[in-house]
Amino acid sequence: NSKGIVSLTSLTSDIIYTLKPEALIGIPGSSILRKNESLKNIPTISEGRTPPNIEKIISLNPKLVIGSEGFHDKTLTKLNELGIDVLSTKVNSWDDLTSLVENISTITNENSQKVFEKLNSCFIEASPKNKKVVVLVSTKPLLSPNDKSWAGSLLERFNLKNLTADLEGSGRMKGYLNLSPEWLIKEEPDNLILIRFGDEQYNEYKNLPFWNDLKAVKNNKINYFDYYGLINVGSLNSINKTCEKLESL
């Protein structure tokens, strides 16, 4: 008799655990969940970037497996063929997030308010900000999110004018595009938001030949954000911290 839910993403694990801890019976082995002591006794069904372990998932006898569209398609299709219910999710906007929370609340028969309380910084009335911003995710290429991405959606929610909002995404990632140095210099963003991965990352920006020609750099308007929360949703806590930080820009 199957009972619980196996979650293949850190965000859905966090949402399920917040709503109904006993419903969560399998989680991904992600760095962001390892920080959460209360999850340490829940079996992990994947490590790092390796695909989830199908045998292990089946052995947990879940009534539902929740994964991420684009990342877990193969796993979910396979489980579905084996007669296990699956749910494929995507969070490319604030609306996607709220519908996901409502959906999982219905599945667990719990009140979605429990989750939204952990996102209180995202529900404050955003102050008007007259700032043109550009988010840079990497130096080679100069990758930046448009309004079809989670990051773009959050910038809009906090009244920040994302200069790349309406630009066409490149390649498979509809929500991201490659910028040219010329474009960046011409558009003159007031603030540059740089994404933290490891230490090497920041120094790379300083080495770009055009870096010191940028208005935001001259005015020292550089804001460092974590990858989790702004680029990858990560967890409820990482989203809440990102909202808090965007409001303070």
Language-model regions: role of each:
Residues 4-69, 160-163:
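A short, structured surface patch at a secondary-structure boundary
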Residues 45-55, 169-182:
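Short helix-initiation/N-cap motifs at beta->coil->alpha
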Residues 3-4, 8, 60, 95-112, ...:
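Structured C-terminal subdomain patch of bacterial secreted/periplasmic proteins
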Residues 28, 151-173, 194, 224-226:
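His/Asp/Glu-enriched short active-site or ligand-binding loop at hydrolase and phosphoryl-transfer sites
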Residues 3-19, 111-159:
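Basic- and aromatic-lined ligand-binding clefts that recognize polyanionic substrates
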Residues 36, 71, 76-103, 224:
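Flexible loop/hinge segments that line or gate small-molecule binding clefts
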Residues 53-67, 84, 178-194:
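Proline-aspartate-enriched helix->loop->beta-strand connector
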Residues 74, 90-105, 136-154, 200:
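Extracytoplasmic ligand-binding site segments that recognize negatively charged/polar headgroups
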